[in-house]
Amino acid sequence: MRIILLGAPGTGKGTQAKLITENYNIPKISTGDILRENIQKKNTIGKKIHNILKNGELVSNRIVCNLIGERIQKKDCIHGFLLDGFPRTQKQAEYISNLKIKIDYVLELIVPYELILKRICGRRVHTPSGRIYNINYNPPREEGKDDLTQEKLTIREDDTIEIVKKRLENYEKNSFLLNKYYLREKKLKKLQYFKIDGKQSIYKIQREIKMMLK
């Protein structure tokens, strides 16, 4: 099963991606994770990515496609995978098609931008484990500290309101053509494409997705 999970930053893609990959035993391929891994390596490409993201810009198609292409070719993807945060542009979608990889499902989470801003700007992260909290919806037991380790929580560099607004503008600019592309693919019966109300609870969304993937 090959799945693409679409949605603007802050729509809950990461949460649903984790649930889907656990249920169907397929690897999650996250653009964000791959980019952050390269930033942590502090190599040439990592430094370039860091400078782009801290300004709220999108990493170029060439860089992202090369990194995702390498990951998809690994053995654990033979029986399927979930792409989280990729593609973000029509060119990236065409790149997947050119790799002769058949996508079975495209799922898109829809959330109003006002709610997205509240979600992202309230986000706090325990960097070593990747655990994520939200001061509005899922606060830690002790303010500013991870529940398990009591270590300090941090705010991602790109989670400020100015940068989030810029990321949403970039997403909106690219999503129109991307949506048209997948609607066309759906009409040609090459894949199934569903839009999901991301304002619902995590578990309602999860149940809805299970029905779609039957």
From Swiss-Prot:
CDD domains: ADK. Keywords: ATP-binding, Cytoplasm, Kinase, Nucleotide biosynthesis, Nucleotide-binding, Transferase. It holds the Pfam family ADK. Residues 122-159 are annotated as: LID. Its main location: cytoplasm. It is an enzyme of class 2 (transferase). Pathway: Purine metabolism; AMP biosynthesis via salvage pathway; AMP from ADP: step 1/1. Residues 30-59 are annotated as: NMP. One of its GO terms (biological process) is AMP salvage. Catalyzes the reversible transfer of the terminal phosphate group between ATP and AMP. Plays an important role in cellular energy homeostasis and in adenine nucleotide metabolism. Belongs to the adenylate kinase family. The gene is adk. This is Adenylate kinase.
